[in-house]
């Protein structure tokens, strides 16, 4: 089964993503901060990570760097309300 890690501090957004994905046959796990997300990533096998950028304890940019170090082949989809060009470019790093 395809497993997806959702890292989102807004419970409503996390629940919306979780429900939509599970209704389409995906297994999901949710973390509400970057540190919890990294721990889940390190202790489980995921095929995709969906993460907010503005997160407590460890922001999405740093989290993504840690995920890339551990497994550069796992796709990371960044969700955010940030819209500046600099923010978008930071997401590619």
Regions found by a protein language model. Give the residues of each.
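N-terminal/domain-start alpha-helical segments
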Residues: 1-93
């Amino acid at each position: 089964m395809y497993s997806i890690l959702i890292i989102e501090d807004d419970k409503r957004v996390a629940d919306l993503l979780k429900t939509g994905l599970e209704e389409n046959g995906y297994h999901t796990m949710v973390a509400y901060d970057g540190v919890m997300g990294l721990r889940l990533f390190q202790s489980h096998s995921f095929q995709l990570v969906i993460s907010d950028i503005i997160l407590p304890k460890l922001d999405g940019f740093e989290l993504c760097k840690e995920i890339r170090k551990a497994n550069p082949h796992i796709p990371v989809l960044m969700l955010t309300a940030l819209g500046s060009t600099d923010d978008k470019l930071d997401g590619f790093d």
